[in-house]
Design a protein with these regions (language model features):
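Flexible, surface-exposed loop/linker segments and immediately adjacent secondary-structure boundaries
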Residues: 106-145, 149-152
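An acidic-aromatic
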Residues: 67, 71-121, 183-184
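Short hydrophobic/aromatic-rich beta-strand segments that constitute the beta-sheet cores
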Residues: 58, 80-84, 99-102, 146, ...
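A short, Trp-centered hydrophobic/proline-enriched beta-strand micro-motif
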Residues: 46-65
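Boundary at the C-terminal end of the N-terminal hydrophobic targeting segment
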Residues: 31-38
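Gly/Pro-enriched, hydrophobic low-complexity segments
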Residues: 130-132, 139-213
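Bacterial N-terminal signal peptides
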Residues: 18-29
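Bacterial N-terminal signal peptides that target proteins for export
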Residues: 3-19
Length: 218
């Protein structure tokens, strides 16, 4: 399949944003800071992980102000799905073990281990803030920002989770890639405690192998 330069460039950028979601690895992000008043980071994390399922809309902003949007579904432990709007049929799916970035139109997919991505920190039944995982916590406007990393699992990657200061609900998160570039996902129209349709988080491993074999043979 041949794509005109404009369409090919747009598709490449979108795949890149998806890649940042699942494979971020960097060192810097927010400057470490303490809030003016004490904030219990573990209490906020426990509130977040008490929500076992949710769905809603999202807007993703890239390092060059690129924006895309879609729907997401989350179920603990370890499962999330992003369906990106647009003709390419791009989705990101975590099934508790792996994460796949899938382009339905081009029949391409990229598979990663969930345990090696910052998404794991969002999807665990409990956010573990022990050791050196908690890098900073601070207040900024109506948000409380908690920055986390886990060097033993995914190197110098980090994720900053931003919670509503009033009700402690998650509003957005930012991931940093290996070049120090930030991608932010903002969620809204969120419903908690939802029932998610069967198959939402299913990864077709056979299709993934076939897609990758076909790609290599082109």
């Amino acid at each position: 399949m041949k794509l005109d330069n404009g369409m090919a460039s747009k598709t490449k950028r979108l795949r890149g944003w998806c890649f940042v979601i699942v494979a971020a690895a960097a060192t810097n992000g927010f400057t470490t800071a303490l809030p003016a008043a004490p904030v219990d980071a573990q209490a906020i994390a426990d509130h977040f992980t008490s929500i076992k399922s949710m769905s809603g809309d999202f807007v993703q902003s890239g390092p060059k102000a690129e924006r895309t949007s879609g729907r997401f579904f989350l179920q603990r432990p370890g499962k999330i799905r992003f369906n990106y709007a647009g003709q390419w049929g791009i989705s990101v799916i975590a099934d508790g073990k792996s994460v796949v970035v899938y382009n339905k139109k081009l029949r391409t997919s990229r598979l990663y281990s969930l345990s090696k991505t910052p998404l794991k920190l969002l999807l665990d039944n409990k956010v573990d803030l022990s050791g050196s995982r908690l890098k900073s916590i601070r207040e900024e406007g109506d948000l409380i920002i908690i920055k986390l990393s886990d060097k033993s699992s995914f190197g110098n990657s980090n994720i900053s989770m931003m919670f509503d200061r009033k009700n402690l609900d998650l509003r957005k998160w930012s991931l940093i890639d290996e070049k120090g570039l930030t991608t932010t996902v903002t969620i809204f129209n969120v419903k908690q405690g939802v029932r998610v349709a069967e198959g939402t988080f299913t990864i077709d491993y056979a299709a993934n192998r076939e897609n990758n074999t076909s790609t290599k043979s082109r």
